[in-house]
Amino acid sequence: MNAIQQKCRPKHQVLVLKCYPRTTKGAVDVKPNSSELSYLLYYAASRKSKFQKVGSFLEKKTASDVWRLRIGNVQVTLQILEALIEKNPKDLPLFAPSVLKILDLVLKSNDITMVESSTPTFEAFCANHDASSLFADQAYLKQYESIVRQYASLASTRRSPGKTTPSKPVAMRWRNTGLEAIRSVASSDALASVQGTQYDILVPMILENLWTDNEEFLEILLHRAHLEEKVDTDKLLLRRRTSVATVRTAEGGNEPNPIALSGSAMDVDKLAEEDIGVLAITCLKQIFVGPNRSQIHAATVALLKFIEERVNQDENVVKKSARTGRDSGWAIKIFGLISRWAPVQERYVILMTTMDTLVRMPLSDESMRHHIVWMAMMGALLRSDVNLIGLSVMDVLLALMQHMKRLVQLPGDPSGASASDMLLPGQPDPRSPTTIAASTAAQATAAARKELLERIQQTIGDLATHVYYADQISDMISAIIQRLRPSKSNSPGNTSPQGEKIDGQVASPEDSTVESLFSLTVAKVAALKAIKTILLVANPRTKMAGNLGLARNKVSISVWEGTQWLLRDPEGLVRKAYADAVITWLDRETVKGDLKAVDESAPNPRASIRYTRDLGKMDVSPARRAASSASTRREPKPTRLHFLNLIHVAIYDNALQYVDYETDINLLHVLLAKLVDRLGINAVRYGLPMIFRLQEDIQEVDAPIGKVRVGCLVHGYLWALTEKFDFENTLVGRAIHNEIIRRRSKHFWIEGVHVPPPLLELIGTPGMVKPQPKMPLNQIESEALLPFDDRFALIDSICTGYQESFASPPTSPAASPGRSFTSPILGSQMSGLSPHTATDDEREVPSRFRDQMYVEWTRDLVIAMVQAGSKSASLNGSKTGTTGTSRYANARLGGNTGSPMASQQNLRPYSQPAGKDTLAPQNNPLAKLRKSSLRSNATPSPASSGPIRSGVTSVDQLKMVLSGQVAPAVVRAQTSHGNGAGGLGADDSTDSLVSYDMTVSEMSFNAGSVTYTPSHPVPRPPSRSRSHSRERRAASRSGAESPGGFDQLSRSNSFGKSNGNGRTIEDGRHDRHDDDGVPPVPPLPSGVSSPPLPPSRDGKSPSPRSPSTQAPVLPPVSLESSAIRPAKTRSLKSRGRHSRSGSIPSAPAPHAMRPATSAGHGVVGGDSAFDLDALLLGIDTKDMQGTLGNVTRPVY
């Protein structure tokens, strides 16, 4: 019967059965007959229809063999399938379902030997499997997923196949078999297909075999995996180089491990664990090395789910070092490994997937640990040397800000403050178990919130580790600041100027929600700390290797525009965090080039040159050039920034508002000192006028200790100036330091105000009352704090120090410039002779800066100018006058003149005027702005009633004066514009093209008029005296007066002010002038004399003038002396022996002055004739040597 049955079998069955050798039951490692197998393969390949029949027959035989535990026959069956797949890979879809069915039968046998024998067959199947076959048949797809799931479950460390628990060696064999199958799946193309994704099954099994509490074990696995990869590569190269005729008798790679031979059972198990771990590392790497974005995304999601499960099981996946504060742990290690394995262009997918998972997960106190772990993983990846090319930094930043918003939305205290209960009447005892448990839970929740908030701000800073485009850091800081700005509907009700009002931006509803949340103190502090972290990370002290070749733009000052209101926040933590962020920016982002004076109002000559050059290159017609090039090629006008101006306003407000808190004064001192140190003259131009105003406002502080604190802030700033501009050894510097030493010796000083300033971390929380220092309050009330009033000498020292700091050594001694300044200050374009080179002009402090330091500062004035100056106004005025300059004029002329600090000389060393309104209009650059017709009927004021406003105002009249056709007095009477000869009314004309103003330095170095005694007080007579310039003005005004002239004059000249010590001092600031660029007065014809003045409107004849009170004869005008350009103040150190102080009218004839009346407005008598000889004797002819004589190019 058996023979008949064999003859009746189909041929393919006969060929298959001949492949099985004769073995006993239970035999293992059985191989098929080679010759019969070869014929079977030829038969199946030649007849394609036989593949399905062979597969069906093998299914039936395998089911029978598995049932009877014929392990040898099962092994032969699996080898036959492997040979069929490898010999005919293109025909695999024909019998692939039979292969999966046979594998399913083997896996369900739960026999470790048969399952281990199936892994080569499954590997061959995965290697030659066509992923497109999964799209067509859903039954086949489910069959494939079932096989993958069964193989993956074998690698689990928590459960084993079978009903009984296997021994440890057998369990390791099961895990190894499962990992081998997973590696086969990971290397197949089907894994990358949409239908073949099994990451939620494969990745968790791999990670289970890698899970450990010892990070060193992972390092060992990585090292061994690297060595095995190297060995495999060497084997591959060796096989390629081996000859076909070479017979290899032994394999050197399968040598036994000496530890397994000589070690104990524990050592063998440890070695087996390492082998499994190496295989798991290889499987995980195989998944992430593929250049498939969806594959990396799905695998990352599976990794995050596995970590979430471990956290739910109270596993410690992230550790924080108590010594260094760095994060470590299994999760961070694995996260870093997969990021390095992934292709460079796909690495960012890992971070973005983690960010999306973090945002989608509900944020509550129960899930706080998950958020902390994921945030730690993201931060560790961002701060590592792994470059995430393609990462959208701004998307991650905005997502982190959104997450911070969700955190502060949680009920309770979002700051993570202490939740300990206090002993209050009527509440349970906190030592009871219930209260202790509740308090402990509240403290743990608060600590978790605080840790998450800190990690969010640290992760935001870690985004700056790698720079992917030039403006990345600036954009990050700007985005954070934008969300800190309150909307107009809920802006804080402080009095600080709001930058967002200037910007004119309208907030969207979404932004309003975020802004309302960021109005919380904790959110503001966290955002500001994040800005500080960004700056610290972007500017490391030691450069990272990954950032050496990357360049970025520095964070400009424009990002801080409109943020000064944060310094005015009522919460001290916010004020400190804001100051800390600004100081960090100054330390890390500013360079030495930022110390150079930058005048944003000056024209850019390079722009015009480049524009002309580019216009010449355009091959178009001239008409088209004129029509189109101006709009397309011209550079935009730079935006005017007001941050430095407004931050000093906020400092001024804080100094007066928080005078009761010593920490606030220390904070302001550190901020001011850092501004001076890092920005130099660019910050001093705004800070110095504010400091002098603050010094005057000391009198308004009620508490004596408050006066001491504000005084410390003022002199601390002056101390910083002496150190920065290196003039501590000058008279001005010694005066400042002597006063500081005196105050410190008398304990009129607070700790923390010194240079260099203390670290901000050492300063306490602003707004917190500290223990009062031991100060002699009785001495504070009795002894005055001597202010510093030598403002002009201080500014000159600052300018000199600035010039010396940028001075470069000459190339040779012969090329060094001389000190004989023979050309006029205004210069002559005809002569072409200029004593200064281009480098000298660059080292000079711009005249605009000098003017701003001379300005009498007021808070309301600055705010008005900023609001109006966003269009065209500036601190130096404009050609036509603007709203900002008009407001300044109104505020300046209507200011308070009764400041007790406004003293010209207050009987102490180094005394110079520093009062509110002691700066004369002719010394005040802003008071000389050109007025429009709208201001022609203004109330008479000192700015419009002086001799400057009543001088020659037209070119024709100037020519008449110079030619001798008419006397200056006649011209003055003709240019009074309806106000009589005296000219005390409002002047509706513009400024004169040439004004006769003396410089401050001329007055201070005029030996005939001013005596400068630095070490002893100036003795004063009992009666009030007046300076020569004041007598000259009074005399000129008394020549012809309107009925209201005396009243206006008495209002504009206030005398008899007290210096705080009961002594009467004068307000003599009006003898200062800032127009130092006027050439010497040319000689007039000898026959010219001053005719009598015409009668005034009221019919009264004016009193004759003395020669010293005549209107000054004006010099010829050059193009550079017009009112369009601001006057340039000459440095004190730039003068030679021959000064122009002798050319002022008061110098040649000091005896011509007459004492003033007791009221200060008496009529000065004198000769009616014009004394030309005395005038000509006072002209310094050496001042015009080296020019074209006394004639320069006129404006006409």
Swiss-Prot record:
GO cellular component: plasma membrane
Record's compositionally biased regions (Basic and acidic residues): 838-847, 1064-1076
Chain intervals with Pro residues compositional bias: 1079-1095
One Gene Ontology term from the biological process aspect of the record: protein localization to plasma membrane
InterPro entries: EFR3, EFR3_HEAT-like_rpt
Record field: compositional bias (Polar residues): 487-498, 819-837, 872-888, 898-909, 934-944, 1049-1062
Record region (Disordered): 486-508, 806-847, 872-951, 1008-1160
Domain of life of the source: Eukaryota
Pfam families xref list: EFR3
Skewed-composition ranges (Basic residues): 1127-1140
PANTHER family, sorted: PROTEIN EFR3 (PTHR47766:SF1)
Protein name per Swiss-Prot or TrEMBL: Protein EFR3
Organism this protein belongs to: Pyricularia oryzae (strain 70-15 / ATCC MYA-4617 / FGSC 8958)
